[in-house]
């Protein structure tokens, strides 16, 4: 999910909760248990968001939200993933989220490979990638997006992410102007293309074709190569809401 605030949007979260319910039912649970992981840095995400994630999930269907909150600089205990049917990683300062989930990475990969539904919200979506865009607004001292979207970083910064999807992900695309960061990172060869997701919009990645839910678009960015494999440009298109 590319961010935004839509606590009453049943479409955005209904599929995720339904998949968690199927997984829970397989072990005899009538109500799915969903881990909600939140990292707070300088009161971001705000109390409204921290308290609102369970309500957003409930809009998608009956579930039990198990919320764990840590401060930036701290890490999650691996026990937060015990006996759950779904995992939501929330939004906030993206580098802090990647640091906080470090002890969970191998376990998350195994669980998702085994069918555990994963929902990344803003920062949680960005770190789901093989190579995660953590933030930044400059490439070689050249501005590539608004500084307000920099995540407390100057140069555009990447790191190994959770490895759940093989394309880079940026968020708040139309609202914060981060699409240009992904375009510039692709043209510079920092990433091999990816997607930038609008707010109140979800990209669903599963065994079938990619799907888009919500009110916005998912912007697909791909490098254009010459016969020698050198990047000569970037193509941009949208995956529209079905």
Predicted segments, located by residue:
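A short, well-structured beta->alpha microelement
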Residues: 62-78
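Catalytic nucleophile loop
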Residues: 88-91, 111-133
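Short helix-loop-beta junction
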Residues: 51-64
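Glycine/threonine-rich flexible loop motifs
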Residues: 94-103
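Conserved beta-strand elements of the Class I
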Residues: 33-35
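C-terminal and late-domain segments of enzyme folds
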Residues: 1-29, 39-47, 55-56, 134, ...
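A short, aliphatic-rich alpha-helical micro-motif
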Residues: 78-82, 112
């Amino acid at each position: 999910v590319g961010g935004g605030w839509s606590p009453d949007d049943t479409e955005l979260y209904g599929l995720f909760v339904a998949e968690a319910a199927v997984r829970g039912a397989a072990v005899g649970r009538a109500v799915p248990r969903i881990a909600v992981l939140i990292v707070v840095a300088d009161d971001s995400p705000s109390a409204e968001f921290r308290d609102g994630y369970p309500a957003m999930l409930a809009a998608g269907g009956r579930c039990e939200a198990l919320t764990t909150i840590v401060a930036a600089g701290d890490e999650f205990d691996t026990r937060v993933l015990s006996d759950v049917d779904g995992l939501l990683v929330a939004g906030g300062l993206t580098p802090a989220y990647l640091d906080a989930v470090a002890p969970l990475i191998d376990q998350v990969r195994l669980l998702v490979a085994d069918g555990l539904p994963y929902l990344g919200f803003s920062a949680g979506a960005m770190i789901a990638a093989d190579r995660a865009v953590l933030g930044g607004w400059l490439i070689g001292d050249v501005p590539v997006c608004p500084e307000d979207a920099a995540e407390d970083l100057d140069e555009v910064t990447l790191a190994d992410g959770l490895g759940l999807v093989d394309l880079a992900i940026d968020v708040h695309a139309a609202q914060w102007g981060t699409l240009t960061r992904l375009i510039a990172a692709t043209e510079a060869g920092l990433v091999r293309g990816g997607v930038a997701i609008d707010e109140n919009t979800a990209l669903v990645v599963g065994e079938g074709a990619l799907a888009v839910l919500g009110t916005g678009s998912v912007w697909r960015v791909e490098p254009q190569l010459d016969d020698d494999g050198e990047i000569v440009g970037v193509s941009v298109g949208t995956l529209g809401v079905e």
